[in-house]
Amino acid sequence: MRVVIAGAGLAGLACAKYLADAGFTPVVLERRDVLGGKIAAWKDEDGDWYETGLHIFFGAYPNMLQLFKELDIEDRLQWKEHSMIFNQPEKPGTYSRFDFPDIPAPINGLVAILRNNDMLTWPEKIRFGLGLLPAIVQGQSYVEEMDKYTWSEWMAKQNIPPRIEKEVFIAMSKALNFIDPDEISATILLTALNRFLQEKNGSKMAFLDGAPPERLCQPLVDYITERGGEVHINKPLKEILLNEDGSVKGYLIRGLDGAPDEVITADLYVSAMPVDPLKTMVPAPWREYPEFKQIQGLEGVPVINLHLWFDRKLTDIDHLLFSRSPLLSVYADMSNTCREYSDPDKSMLELVLAPAQDWIGKSDEEIVAATMAEIKQLFPQHFNGDNPARLLKSHVVKTPRSVYKATPGRQACRPDQRTSVPNFYLAGDFTMQKYLGSMEGAVLSGKQCAQAIAADFNPQTVPPTREIVTVG
């Protein structure tokens, strides 16, 4: 059976991969000229890559890690030491670390927290631990139930001191969903904390060794095409065409550069588009179906990713850093963390500006200037003096609608991969799966979509979703 998939991000490509495994013929259509969706990247005139986001692979990403294994590209993940490193704004140029020892979970996480005396006092650690007990004891059902609260509200409910939010969770909230704790659903942070505490290597981080379209998406494309599938770029979906009974008749693809529109048909159809464009594409007869009503409550969150090249090394740290800056979220010196971007003499900082709502409409020059002011606080030793570090060039990548904005109540808006339309399915990290808006969530949604199709139309099975895998 032929299955046409709109969208070549991780959800669409993962869906196609697992459909190919189950004996289907997937045909993936991507509207842009680059693969990857939210992990897309481009090369500039100097041959330097710039990316949509700063992409981190966690040990708590079992389906993503399984995918790397199945593609035989595990060596492309560059694992970092098991730590979480925070800037200390009150002591510019210094860091506070949570180092996880090589012992079983949750003991390793508790030791990491107890050893850190820079950010939290002992009474605060005890209050935080007591506040977390319901989530640890009651598990996922409690975590899901807390979707009615923001993280700030949940912390107040649990009598956790507000300073803990300021010291740790503003940074974590911005890293997970690009918004602040007074907006983000408590479910998001509790889910992350649960995975990090329950799995020995859950919070261990890896960087991809190069640009995602080449190092992750292309192996997926090769895998799909070797098994009879197809992947096409520059194929924007214009309209979902319907039969009289409301099922899908075909995908109308907009012709580019003067070419005529074309209709692509198949036995089954998948949307692996982000939720915002999907909402605009829903045909009128479908709008009363529950899943298409549900998604009206979802919208993508804006985010800005910056790349800044300097004339010297600003840091030797080979890891993700939590800036704890009012403007920025996480950042890394990619000349240290990523093999393809390696440079022993010059830094290339990749930084996430979040929340980005007030900045998405500003010029690149304004954004770079504001970011540079923050960088001077992060690396004062390189900017104070007679010979300050010099910015050589920059790239700013704006995503007005990224992952869905995970405010309270959004869990109820996330649809299943099956729809009320018998030949139409959904994939995307906004669909219901337990890893929320993330690369793992995208891969898992694609796998779950393929599993649903295989269960409905083919006795061959897709490999089961993974719970935990061991990482190096």
UniProtKB/Swiss-Prot annotation:
Keywords: Carotenoid biosynthesis, Cell membrane, FAD, Flavoprotein, Herbicide resistance, Membrane, NAD, Oxidoreductase. It is found in: Cell membrane. It holds the Pfam family Amino_oxidase. Its cofactor is NAD(+); NADP(+); FAD. GO terms for cellular component: plasma membrane. Its EC number is 1.3.99.-. This is Phytoene dehydrogenase. It comes from Synechocystis sp. (strain ATCC 27184 / PCC 6803 / Kazusa). The gene is pds.
